[in-house]
Every structure is written in structure tokens, then in C-alpha cells.
Amino acid sequence: SGISQDEKEVLDCMSVFPEKISIEEIELLMKGMDRLTLLKILERLQEGFLIKEVLVGWNVYYKFVHRIFQEYIYEKQSNGKKQLYHKMLAAYYEAQAEQDFTVLPLVVYHYDKCHDQVKAYQYQIRYLKEFYTVINENFPVLHTEASDFGDDFGVMAEAAKMLELAEDVINLKDDSREIRQMKMEMHYIKGRYDIAMGDYDSGIANIEKSIFLAQKLNAHKNLLACYKQQVFHGIQRE
């Protein structure tokens, strides 16, 4: 049998989430519907084997039974509608990220999907910086807390990802203040990595580019960090 308009609406909302979804998250996009009605719709969709319940502890989440069906539902919606949903969710997770940095990949995901490149890069940098630290020039060392996050976005927590991101940011044509700030950070990260790997010429060149941008932006903390790298490099070379 066919699905009702309300059921279709719930499936549309669910399709914009990358992973499992709580009822509170569905309610964000289904503002006009009360919870009991929504629960009944979710039950009917489960009976039709379109979605399933996932229990995490005592928390109930929902997800599509088949990824391919989720993609089909997603693609059938207008770009305007999808973009609006992604914007609403990006703002929601952005507010949550102040207390809980593990939602940052979701902020990145939704900003990326509504084509806000600057915000997507800003939050990706913030997320990766939360995860990585440089200890004794071994770049990067994963914080132990990273393992608590699970594997949903584990792929983002790789050194290769950070360096790829650095390249993408450095190659951006945009010259706004935010982008220059990000380029400054990425040159610094690349510089530290290169120096740690023994590629001193490239490392120092990146640190110098970071210094140039930091001076333009009056970013004193960043300048200090760059100068420290130059000092470490001098010590290492002797």
C-alpha cells in the first residue's frame, strides 16, 4: 500500500540526517506535529520495514532500513527544501557544540550540504583541532577521548584528513578575513607537520606564510606560536 502524506513528510525529514535520529531531532523539522502523532507515524513506517528502531542504552533512535532507500527519498526532494532543512540542523547543532564538541562533525555535515563553505571549513578545523595535539613534534597524536566518540566520523580523525583540509583551505580563492584566518592556521599546521617529518624547508616556508598572515590579522597568539616553531626548528638543526 502507498504511504500517506504525513508519512512521506517524516521520511523526507529523516533522509537529511547522515546517521541515526532521535525523535527530538525529527521534531525540529516537523514543528506542526505533536509527539503522539509522530510516534504513530514512526510505528507505521517500522511496520512497513522502511525504518527501524535503534536502542542506545535507554535512548531510542530511528534509521532507514536501507541506505539506498534513504538516498532515493533525499534525491526526490527539491533543493530548496533540502537546503532549508540542512540550515535548520546546522544552526541547531552549532548551538549544541558549545557544550559538546562531539556534535561538530554534524555541524560540518549540514553546513557542507547547504553550501556554506566557510562555516563548514571553520567547524572542521575546530573539530580536528579538538582531536589533535602535537607532542614532542610527533604530529598528530590522537587524544585518548577520541576513542569515546565512536566510529561514525572516525575517518575525519586522521592525519591525512587534516593535511587534505589544509590544502583545500590554502587553495581557496576567497580572501575574506575568515578565510585568511583559516589559511593562517592551516599554514601553521602544515609547517609543524613538515618540520616533524624532517621536511624543514617546506615547514619553515609554511610557518613564514602563517607569520605573514598573522601580522596582517594582528593575531598575536598565532604569531607567538609561529615564533616558537622557528626557535624549536633552530634547536633541532644545531
What is each of the regions a protein language model found here?
Residues S1-K161:
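Short secondary-structure boundary elements
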Residues L11, L42-L45, L213, L217, ...:
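Generic leucine side-chain signal with a strong bias for well-ordered alpha-helical environments
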Residues Q46-E47, I195, I211:
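Alpha-helix C-terminal capping/helix-coil junction sites
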Residues Y72, Y109-C114, L128-E130, T144-V155, ...:
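Tandem amphipathic alpha-helical repeat scaffolds
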Residues E94-F101, L165-K183, L213-L223:
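Flexible helix-coil transition and linker loops at the boundaries of alpha-helical arrays
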Residues V107, R126-Y127, A159-V169, G203, ...:
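Tetratricopeptide repeat
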Residues T144-D168, L172-D175, R180, D199:
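Short, Lys/Arg-enriched, disordered terminal segments
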Residues A166, H187, G191, G203-N206, ...:
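Small side chains
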